[in-house]
Amino acid sequence: MELDAILDNLSDEEQIELLELLEEEENYRNTHLLYEFAPYSKQREFIDAGHDYPERCFMAGNQLGKSFTGAAEVAFHLTGRYPGTKGYPADGKYGGEWKGKRFYEPVVFWIGGETNETVTKTTQRILCGRIEENDEPGYGSIPKEDIISWKKSPFFPNLVDHLLVKHHTADGVEDGISICYFKPYSQGRARWQGDTIHGVWFDEEPPYSIYGEGLTRTNKYGQFSILTFTPLMGMSDVVTKFLKNPSKSQKVVNMTIYDAEHYTDEQKEQIIASYPEHEREARARGIPTMGSGRIFQIPEETIKCQPFECPDHFYVIDAQDFGWNHPQAHIQLWWDKDADVFYLARVWKKSENTAVQAWGAVKSWANKIPVAWPHDGHQHEKGGGEQLKTQYADAGFSMLPDHATFPDGGNSVESGISELRDLMLEGRFKVFNTCEPFFEEFRLYHRDENGKIVKTNDDVLDATRYGYMMRRFARMMRDIRKPKEKKIPAPIRPVRRGR
């Protein structure tokens, strides 16, 4: 029933009461936006990664929700109202419990942005609301009821210097005061020195010196930094550190316009077309401009295809790249010999999983299919344990007898990459659009300033290369589904000879 029809059936007093209730509900929603945050899968992946990685980089295109993600996470830390705790409402829209980094005490956070103006219009607006409209914070990600007090900055109109925020335990009990400071990069490195804080959020890419200073301020509490930005400056020092020389504490999550659920397919294509061609990769896909350094300078739409059932006459091979601290990867490659076209149909990638765990994850599609593997499969566990290859064979994988090589015995990375790239350009290498881990690596695979391939974040690509190199051992899907029955010849009857 429409609101007007409902109102017509109510007395004047009832109408006033109903409108007051609706107004009260809207006001509550506007001052508790944190509870409306329902992360997309990429946003959730970034937040969850905080459990294992002190330094995280959310590299995303424009207007995809990266700053809202950063603001929501900071608000959860400032208030302690993590999803799944008593401080978070049962009807909140987060969906599931909090799996990311968790602080168990009131925190001090620094929020960084490029200038006083951009801080006011972006991070501060998302965390606090528009001060120029409301004359007070409380209309952003930080619930209004949790803001104790705030102080304006003398450096720019409506810029907040800092906020005092109520912090809560997992039982929803207030246990102290968190502090949130806003800091622009434009004030220089000196303004980023001297304090001890729990965490720092850099929205838009900071100069490397300021990134280092901000991170250093968090050393006492184990280090904590998050970056959310569109990489319009290409392979800057910060981007280079995370992509080319990452430490074990660093994690990059890439989000493209195709991961944003608030746009229709038509809107996505319209937005991409509106960007200057040389900026499309950065603005739509969050991919830094790498110039001639990027290896696959091929539009990913030209190699993407819809998933389909594997025909009986296709040949199939699986392949894997071993890993523990960095992810291991398992892929499945289909080969249509008639058309000489390859399809990457399945991908699985995960860190710190044993051979048995990996088999449990891929058994449904890897059973009885030959598996190509790299030369490090000959290595033994520390302390003289089994070879890696043997561990995976024991778990259930149909490991090929020898490690991956070309038919001539070579295993050149350059040769493998070159052949795969040529197949892509000729339209003879396709990837199911469900294989997102492949595309995440495909977008960022590059060479360094000396022309050498940077061997980071390449687990799926390596596995794909191994499968392609060993395609001569692929099995026809018909034989995998319906193994040939061994026909036992009839016994030979003795021939009677005449006397």
From Swiss-Prot:
Region (ATPase activity): 1-286
Region entry Interaction with the terminase small subunit, spans: 1-58
Ranges where the record places region Nuclease activity: 312-482
Family affiliation: Belongs to the Lederbergvirus large terminase family.
Cofactor(s) it depends on: Mg(2+)
Motif segment (Walker A motif): 60-67
Amino acids binding Mg(2+): 321, 459
Biological-process GO terms, alphabetical: chromosome organization; viral DNA genome packaging
Function according to Swiss-Prot or TrEMBL: The terminase large subunit acts as an ATP driven molecular motor necessary for viral DNA translocation into empty capsids and as an endonuclease that cuts the viral genome to initiate and to end a packaging reaction. The terminase lies at a unique vertex of the procapsid and is composed of two subunits, a small terminase subunit involved in viral DNA recognition (packaging 'pac' sequence), and a large terminase subunit possessing endonucleolytic and ATPase activities. Both terminase subunits heterooligomerize and are docked on the portal protein to form the packaging machine.
Protein species of origin: Salmonella phage P22 (Bacteriophage P22)
Name of this chain's protein: Terminase, large subunit
Catalytic-site annotation from UniProt: 204 (for atpase activity)
Residue numbers covered by motif Walker B motif: 199-204
CC cofactor note: Nuclease activity probably requires 2 Mg(2+) ions per subunit.
GO molecular function annotation: ATP binding; ATP hydrolysis activity; endonuclease activity; metal ion binding
EC number: 3.1.21.-, 3.6.4.-
Keyword entries, A-Z: ATP-binding, Endonuclease, Hydrolase, Late protein, Magnesium, Metal-binding, Nuclease, Nucleotide-binding, Viral genome packaging, Viral release from host cell
Entries under Pfam families matching the protein: Terminase_6C (PF17289), Terminase_6N (PF03237)
Subunit structure and binding partners: Interacts with the terminase small subunit; the active complex is composed of dimer of terminase large subunits and a nonamer ring of terminase small subunits. Interacts with the portal protein; this interaction allows the packaging of viral DNA.
Domain of life where this protein originates: Viruses
Entry remark concerning the domains of this protein: The ATPase region is in the N-terminus, whereas the nuclease region is in the C-terminus.
Any one Gene Ontology cellular component term annotated for this protein: viral terminase, large subunit
Entry-linked InterPro entries: P-loop_NTPase, Terminase_6C, Terminase_large_su_BPP22
